[in-house]
Amino acid sequence: MAMQRFDVSCDPSVYEAWPDLVATQSERLLCFFCECTHHGDRSYSRIVYVASDDHGRTWSDKIALSEPIHSDGSAFWNCPRATRLRDGRIAVICDRTSRRDETQAEVHLWMGDPEGMHFEGPVNLHLQGIVPDKLLELQSGRWIVACHLGNVDGFANLQQRLYYSDDAGAHWHGPVTVARDARYNLCEASILEVEPDLLVCFMRENSSMGYECMACMSHDGGLTWGELYTVPLAGCHRPVAGFLDTGEILITYRYRQGAQKGWLGHWTQNTFLAVTDRETVCSASRDRQQVRIMPLHYDPSSEADLGYTGWVQFRDGEIYIVDYIRGDQPKCHIIATALRREDIGGL
């Protein structure tokens, strides 16, 4: 089939951004995102969601997940992430943070029923960090929440950390240092369980140098981590990795060219999609790596802003990806693309 594009939510009164997506067991879609004043103005923020019962062809009106925050920037909701747990419940986490002092940021949790009809929360998990990965449930039953932070533990640069729970969130342990390196700013992790307790952490490098996707591995369920290496995804920001039904790995990400001048519109113009395999993501050797990359979304606006994505694959094989974009609208809004593996081409 040809790629199809959809509007998920387009409310010109607010800035809609940073979506994530989850499918229930019945394949009902829930798209969570933040509405705020602007990317650079969080004087108003609220986490909302919309639902679809027809594989994302039409969407409900927005439903509030959080209470709104009105502030001078001292507190705001940031980036929600959603997971369907093995028992069917829908777990949504989001960082509540501050532009004044990000070390005060903490992750909050909402728990929903298996169809996402009702959510309870938020519960402050008291996990320190911003822009969390999805709550990851390992095959062992361990829960992991990865988030990053700078200017902590005597280390100025951004470092990637995680917290874990072995009793379904009743008690949390950490932080565990996933990756920190004085040469880099490591953040916005996407952790993938490649085999039982073998984890690969894909990371954004935030020095505006166009570095490839940074990665490291754990062989013990996230308790310890190895050395940094790169996966051949140049300029990779906010990767979102998962398995396709073929056994291949799909990664969606913002392409961020190496340039330090300007901000929105200068280097937030493209979202890419990549297909790769287990050997590639677990190897630091170029002769063992392969990846196929295709452009997904382009924002022509002079104030372009996009590239935080979420995706699912339906049982019929269709891949459905949500993103946010400015485009020809007065403010950013939520869009989606539907495609199939054959639309991407072979490795």
Model-predicted segments: where are they?
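Asp-box/BNR beta-propeller blade signature and adjacent active/binding-site loops
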Residues: 1-347
